[in-house]
Design a protein with these regions (language model features):
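Glycine-rich helix-loop "coupling/hinge" segments at transmembrane-helix boundaries
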Residues: 99, 167-193
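Transmembrane alpha-helices and adjacent helix-loop boundaries
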Residues: 46, 70-72, 87-93, 105, ...
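Transmembrane-helix boundary motif in ABC transporter permease subunits
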Residues: 45-82
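Generic hydrophobic transmembrane alpha-helix motif, especially the helices
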Residues: 78-115
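Alpha-helical membrane-interface segments at transmembrane helix boundaries
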Residues: 37-45, 78-85, 165, 187-191
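Membrane-cytosol interface at the C-terminal ends of specific transmembrane alpha-helices
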Residues: 104-163, 170
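Hydrophobic alpha-helical segments of membrane proteins
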Residues: 48-59, 92-96, 152, 156-175
């Protein structure tokens, strides 16, 4: 009788253990499908959109800040603007754009693109100053695109891919401002505690 009592206790423990495991698997699958997967997808989409806009901003910012293309005075003014834009944190831009545009992914994309695009353009244009151009350089956009841009573009892309990691991390953190990235779900978990 003692062995049957132990067997019954073992079976009830196994059943409750299996039920516990089943509940854990159900909870984990709900968590992954309802929060983790949508958060990761939104984070990646926002980061890739910000990366693309940062690239465009860096291309335009470096072109208008080149002394050979826009003149010394305007280039210096543009460089000062790039310096200011890269100095303002993404969170400040995101907060201001969220007040102006409402809560969506657009304020975060614009904030990340402006900050990182200005940073990359500023660093790239410093490299462009060292590029020597031929005697046939005409001082127009086509001359810039033919002689200067090919010389600075590999460095620009290296900086852009380096900053992608930062953009991805900042995208997750910007979720705490209410954008539905992975940071949003992390923040709501702490609110529930």
């Amino acid at each position: 009788q003692d062995s049957s009592l132990q067997s019954h206790a073992y079976q009830s423990g196994a059943i409750s253990g299996m039920a516990l495991l089943s509940q854990f698997v159900d909870w984990l699958s709900r968590l992954l499908s309802e929060q983790a997967l949508p958060g990761v997808i939104a984070t990646l989409l926002l980061a890739l959109a910000a990366l693309g806009m940062s690239h465009l901003f860096a291309l335009i910012g470096s072109a208008v800040s080149d002394k050979r293309l826009s003149g010394r005075f305007i280039a210096n003014i543009n460089r000062l603007g790039l310096l200011v834009l890269r100095s303002v944190p993404e969170y400040i831009f995101a907060f201001v754009f969220m007040l102006l545009l409402g809560p969506s992914m657009l304020p975060a994309i614009l904030a990340l693109a402006i900050h990182n695009g200005a940073l990359i353009a500023y660093l790239t244009i410093r490299h462009a100053d060292d590029v020597t151009v031929s005697a046939h350089f005409n001082g127009r956009l086509d001359g810039y695109g033919y002689e200067v841009l090919p010389a600075i573009y590999p460095n620009m892309m290296a900086l852009l891919f380096y900053r992608f990691e930062v953009i991805l991390r900042e995208t997750a953190i910007l979720g705490m401002l209410g954008i539905a990235t992975s940071g949003f779900y992390f923040d709501s978990i702490f609110d529930a505690i």
